[in-house]
Swiss-Prot record:
Record family assignment: Belongs to the glutamate 5-kinase family.
EC number assigned by the record: 2.7.2.11
Native organism: Shewanella halifaxensis (strain HAW-EB4)
Gene: proB
Name this protein carries in UniProt: Glutamate 5-kinase
Database matches in InterPro entries: AceGlu_kinase-like_sf (IPR036393), Asp/Glu/Uridylate_kinase (IPR001048), G5K_ProB (IPR041739), Glu/AcGlu_kinase (IPR001057), Glu_5kinase (IPR011529), Glu_5kinase/COase_Synthase (IPR005715), Glutamate_5-kinase_CS (IPR019797), PUA (IPR002478)
């Protein structure tokens, strides 16, 4: 690889189940060899690589001889527990061919929700990278429940990119990228090569495109791309079976769909608000409050709140939505849901009179808010 061609220095590569199995029921070891070779070439060229890998459940099924198990969470956790060790062993053996070591990081949303644990995860990730070790990240499916799951490795890889301050996230799938129609149904569908803004029309376009295996489809990849690009990370969605795809993307060659990063990315704490804590509830805003928050950079005041959904505590992350449920922002509430219900629609000057105390005029301060 020509060093002068390299456009990025720290890269997160996400491999979906459909890429690792090539559409079969077991890991495609031959293809994993090729992917490991590409990543090893990057490492040798001075590019730091983080691997976010799916495939634990598929590996577990294969190792146990495809057992007949009930379709329950416990069965999936069993398969993940068995398969994760097989998956990390396979990657360790493959990278050892090139004299490279790997380190395993298993995460849940709980590790990202708490600010201290989030920073600890970041320190661990950076320690591996700084010592020339390839971090291999997966969700800890053996213990994760619906409440603490990130949900898919697309979103997990975006959060990993934020954790390690990567400048590129590569999402490899069984599709060539994002198309203007479903290529499996429409032979005239055209590949979208460049995306500078993710809007509702693009989200609708991606909504129906789902990979054959795994938990992620094109919609989750779009969510991941949106998180990453807001933090200043460029994103490429491409086919994991395209020849030399990883190297070509890192050398900025035209492959897949490229999402440009925001020119002015979010600062670190707001990155955490966006990607770390799960929203515990919602507040419904009137049109004036939506305009103030999204267009004028204002804090959310109690006067602009129409309704409160869900139960949340002071300091929890909540979503700011309109009457139709569209999410406009995400932020940390300075008041619990019961208090917000009491002061909703009331002037900020009356908060102390209503509650007997106050934590400031803003329900969500602009410094604790990310506009989406």
């Amino acid at each position: 690889m020509n060093l002068s061609e390299i456009s990025y220095r720290r890269v997160v590569v996400k491999l979906g189940t459909s890429v690792l199995t090539s559409g079969s029921l077991k890991l495609d070891k031959a293809h994993m060899v090729e992917l490991a070779r590409q990543m090893a070439c990057l490492m040798k060229a001075g590019v730091e690589v983080v691997l976010c890998t799916s495939g634990a459940i598929a590996a577990g099924k294969e190792h146990l001889g495809y057992p007949q198990l009930p379709d329950t969470i416990a069965s999936k956790q069993l398969l993940a527990a068995v398969g994760q060790s097989q998956l990390i062993l396979a990657w360790s053996q493959l990278f050892s061919i090139y004299g490279l070591h790997v380190g395993q990081l298993l995460l849940t949303r709980a590790d990202l929700h708490d600010r201290e644990r989030y920073l600890n995860a970041r320190d661990s990730l950076n320690a591996l990278l700084n010592n020339g070790i390839i971090p291999i990240i997966n969700e800890n499916d053996a213990v994760a429940t619906a409440e603490i799951k990130v949900g898919d490795n697309d979103n997990l890889s975006a959060r990993a990119a934020l954790l390690c301050d990567a400048d590129l996230l590569i999402l490899l799938t069984d599709q060539k990228g994002l198309f203007d129609a479903d290529p499996r149904k429409n032979p005239d569908a055209k590949l979208i090569t460049e995306v500078q803004n993710i809007d509702d029309s693009l989200r609708m376009l991606a909504g129906g495109a789902v990979s054959g295996l795994g938990t992620g489809g094109m919609a989750t990849k779009l969510e991941a791309a949106d998180i990453a690009r807001r933090a200043g990370v460029e994103v490429v969605i491409a086919s994991g079976h395209h020849k030399d795809v990883i190297q070509n993307v890192v050398c900025a060659k035209p492959v897949g769909t490229h999402f440009t990063a925001l020119e002015h990315p979010l600062e670190s704490r707001k990155q955490w608000i966006l990607a770390g804590p799960k929203a515990r509830g919602q507040v419904v805003l009137d049109t004036g409050a939506i305009t103030a928050v999204t267009q004028k950079g204002r804090s959310l005041l109690s006067k602009g709140i129409i309704e409160v959904n869900g139960l949340f505590q002071r300091g929890d992350t909540i979503e700011l939505v309109d009457t139709k449920g569209k999410v406009y922002a995400k932020g940390m509430s300075r008041y619990g849901s019961l208090d917000v219900s009491k002061i909703a629609g009331k002037h900020s000057d009356n908060i102390e009179e209503i509650l007997g105390y106050d934590y400031g005029d803003a329900v969500v301060h602009r410094n604790d808010m990310v506009v989406l």
